[in-house]
Amino acid sequence: MAAGGGGSCDPLAPAGVPCAFSPHSQAYFALASTDGHLRVWETANNRLHQEYVPSAHLSGTCTCLAWAPARLQAKESPQRKKRKSEAVGMSNQTDLLALGTAVGSILLYSTVKGELHSKLISGGHDNRVNCIQWHQDSGCLYSCSDDKHIVEWNVQTCKVKCKWKGDNSSVSSLCISPDGKMLLSAGRTIKLWVLETKEVYRHFTGHATPVSSLMFTTIRPPNESQPFDGITGLYFLSGAVHDRLLNVWQVRSENKEKSAVMSFTVTDEPVYIDLTLSENKEEPVKLAVVCRDGQVHLFEHILNGYCKKPLTSNCTIQIATPGKGKKSTPKPIPILAAGFCSDKMSLLLVYGSWFQPTIERVALNSREPHMCLVRDISNCWAPKVETAITKVRTPVMNSEAKVLVPGIPGHHAAIKPAPPQTEQVESKRKSGGNEVSIEERLGAMDIDTHKKGKEDLQTNSFPVLLTQGLESNDFEMLNKVLQTRNVNLIKKTVLRMPLHTIIPLLQELTKRLQGHPNSAVLMVQWLKCVLTVHASYLSTLPDLVPQLGTLYQLMESRVKTFQKLSHLHGKLILLITQVTASEKTKGATSPGQKAKLVYEEESSEEESDDEIADKDSEDNWDEDEEESESEKDEDVEEEDEDAEGKDEENGEDRDTASEKELNGDSDLDPENESEEE
């Protein structure tokens, strides 16, 4: 039982190549390479058995494949004979190979006929097919896709039997239970379905990344004393993309425990898994895991309850080339797939190149924790050329054959035999012949002989060049595109870039930002366009922070020093302007101007005369003050005397007035008196 590297759901991750051994006998090894070709190899003699190229192999590449189960024995009474059509259908199904494509269709290829058997399209998937599983009893198959649905197909009628939604996100892996009544499906979480009712029986936690492989590890539960319903107590294994842990789960009667009971740890992401089923509680499970780094890890463990610590491999297998000479060093050879043989004591290893793999049977030795096999595969990769490659091929004709050519009936043109290839063709021309020059020929053909100026590169070629440069790490090609200064050209190029090249482009821009300042200015324009145009795509990436962490730290460091640089820039401008102004005014003559105020310093003799004059002036000033005070006193005395005289006159007037009132005399006029009366 094996699970091949079907495909990664991450667009940025390198996709695994779908491959699988034929069931039971493992006589064939099917491999769908990246060029869209299906190749079937014989494992016994490492020979190519068949090769099939689908019509849409470039647009609809193969994403997963699965062999049909071995020949089924129908449970019928001996009196009833099997129909001829049923027998033919059963034998044909034995050698069918199901291929899932990136466009949602499923192809059934017959290895017996060497041609396409049928195609499953109508009512199926609308997106990439991630996994295919054949049912071992009913002659149907199940498929899951990125469109979130699971489809049950009838292989005989090529129609959909049932279709239901498997998850809120894409469904990446499937596995059918040993009794054929349950189905495991996984996106990030794992669900156990009842096939009869299409209802969820159990939920499991799953992995943080999309699950790439699912398989049951046991047929019977460890506790055989309790009644067995076909699923309770069984263990199954799951592996995920970018996850170095393989988790083991147990289906229990209660629905409380949803976490894994144990896990196996490997060195890298698993791309191919094969195991031997445990038929009783005392038989250990043997597990072979092929990692992306090209190593094979072998595990052997009895599944019996919970284990807290992750289990490490019992044996690790590597393959390397022999070092030729003292200076040459051995190079590792990647292992592509590994499967247990029927005796469970040996292993089939597929290593080398996907286009020309090498298949070898290796005996297992549990005593050695590490095995390194030295293999020379240089001869296997060399293409065999039987005939010389020539551009010109002459047809082989019989000397007695007659060749008919157009002409008048009855007249036969003489056919000269072709000259042998050993003769040399004369390359010298006859001198003195009247030969027309090339310029005259072009003039006669009315062709413009003037050379056209060098045209500018078209905009649509920039995305192609940039994509090729990022994939091949071509420095000259990247410089040709990234050193452009036209902002409109940069925007159009970024708009036409494929989505899977955005992260490599940002990483290349980050690398160039750390270089020369002149190139960093150009990279800032590219970076601005990428972040503005593809902001929605970047926000959907789950691992955006670790991928763009270097760019973020670089921007933060540049922003921190911006204020200091601006202050320094202002000071430098001030100093430079002052220096330039002083240099300009140094040589120029200033125009004549009159001083608004002139201060002259006096000598020491003048200062002494001034001091004497100041003293005299101070003495005179004191005398003047005394005289002014005496004059003020005299004036005050005179004013007092005048005031006393006036007071005396007023007193006399008052006395006379009072006497007149007493005597009845008044100073009123007669008219006034009459008025009073």
From Swiss-Prot:
There is a cross-link at residues 309, 384 (Glycyl lysine isopeptide (Lys-Gly) (interchain with G-Cter in SUMO1)). There is a cross-link at residues 309, 384 (Glycyl lysine isopeptide (Lys-Gly) (interchain with G-Cter in SUMO2)). WD repeats lie at residues 11-51, 57-119, 124-163, 166-205, 207-259, 267-309. Residues 414-445, 582-677 are annotated as: Disordered. The modification Phosphoserine is found at residues 77, 399, 431, 437, 590, 658. Gene3D superfamilies: YVTN repeat-like/Quinoprotein amine dehydrogenase (2.130.10.10). Residues 582-592 have a biased composition (Polar residues). InterPro entries: SSU_processome_Utp12, U3_snoRNA-assoc_WDR, WD40/YVTN_repeat-like_dom_sf, WD40_repeat_dom_sf, WD40_rpt. The modification Phosphothreonine is found at residues 321, 394, 656. Keywords: Isopeptide bond, Nucleus, Phosphoprotein, Repeat, Ribosome biogenesis, RNA-binding, rRNA processing, Transcription, Transcription regulation, Ubl conjugation, WD repeat. Part of the small subunit (SSU) processome, composed of more than 70 proteins and the RNA chaperone small nucleolar RNA (snoRNA) U3. May be a component of the proposed t-UTP subcomplex of the ribosomal small subunit (SSU) processome containing at least UTP4, WDR43, HEATR1, UTP15, WDR75. Binds to RNA; binding is required for its chromatin association. Interacts with CDK9, DDX21 and SUPT6H. Interacts with RNA polymerase II. Interacts directly with UTP4 and UTP15. Belongs to the UTP5 family. This is WD repeat-containing protein 43.
